[in-house]
């Protein structure tokens, strides 16, 4: 969950997000070192009065400033490619959840269970309970089991949307007529918030996403109860 005046990323609850945070810190340190070196060279050039007028070429320096950037790019590219392949790894999922974007709400279908489908609308401000978040609460929370691989199938019925939950490191476009998939897993129980991250019309800001991860046994009881009620 984001907080006022927060400088860093949200706390990770999935292995992918932990890898993304580590890569962010890795890239930021490289940028900091490069910026420090550039500022140091600029300060030297502005403060020194010494010049080397007889130098026509410098093969050693040219070799250094050609090889060094290549090494830096490799140091950034290798962990980035590793995370990219991790996001495309789909082990045998325990559960498949389909999210469909509409103007301006989300609908979910539990594809592994019969007739489990819900529409989720934003909770109006005057219905909020103490401690709930404005523009982030919905009338029905999406319930999922923790410590389980969950495959998300994401699409749209009208215009472009984007299904994004920062704490899980997930952001997948919802495109009409196309199914995109993403894998997510939470290592701890709790509520995790997201929003539509693609401009989709006048009420784009009113498409929150709320995932409630619970223990596996509780999820089985919850799913069984809903199945019995739907009969």
Swiss-Prot record:
Its EC number is 7.1.1.9. Keywords: Copper, Electron transport, Magnesium, Membrane, Metal-binding, Mitochondrion, Mitochondrion inner membrane, Respiratory chain, Translocase, Transmembrane, Transmembrane helix, Transport. PROSITE patterns: COX2 (PS00078), COX2_CUA (PS50857), COX2_TM (PS50999). Binds a dinuclear copper A center per subunit. Gene3D superfamilies: 1.10.287.90, Cupredoxins - blue copper proteins. It is a multi-pass membrane protein. Residues 1-14, 88-231 are mitochondrial intermembrane. Mg(2+) binds at residue 198. It holds the Pfam family COX2. Belongs to the cytochrome c oxidase subunit 2 family. This is Cytochrome c oxidase subunit 2. It comes from Lagothrix lagotricha (Brown woolly monkey).
């Amino acid at each position: 969950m984001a907080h006022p005046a927060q400088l860093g990323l949200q706390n990770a609850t999935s292995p992918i997000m932990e890898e993304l945070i580590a890569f962010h810190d890795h890239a930021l340190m490289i940028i900091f070192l490069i910026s420090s070196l550039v500022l140091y060279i600029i300060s030297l050039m502005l403060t020194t009065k010494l010049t080397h007028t007889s130098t026509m070429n410098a093969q050693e320096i040219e070799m250094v400033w050609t090889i060094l950037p290549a090494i830096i790019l490799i140091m950034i590219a290798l962990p980035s490619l590793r995370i990219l392949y991790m996001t495309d790894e789909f082990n045998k999922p325990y559960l498949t959840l389909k999210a469909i974007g509409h103007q301006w709400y989300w609908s979910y279908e539990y594809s592994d269970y019969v007739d489990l489908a819900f529409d989720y609308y934003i909770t109006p401000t005057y219905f909020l309970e103490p401690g709930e978040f404005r523009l982030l609460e919905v009338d029905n929370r999406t319930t999922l089991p923790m410590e389980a691989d969950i495959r998300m199938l994401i699409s749209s019925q009208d215009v472009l949307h984007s299904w994004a939950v920062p704490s899980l490191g997930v952001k997948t476009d919802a495109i009409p007529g196309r199914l995109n998939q993403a894998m997510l897993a939470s290592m701890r129980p709790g509520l995790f918030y997201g929003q539509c991250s693609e401009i989709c019309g006048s009420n784009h800001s009113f498409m929150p996403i709320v995932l409630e991860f619970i223990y596996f046994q509780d999820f089985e009881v919850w799913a069984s109860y809903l199945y019995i009620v739907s009969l």
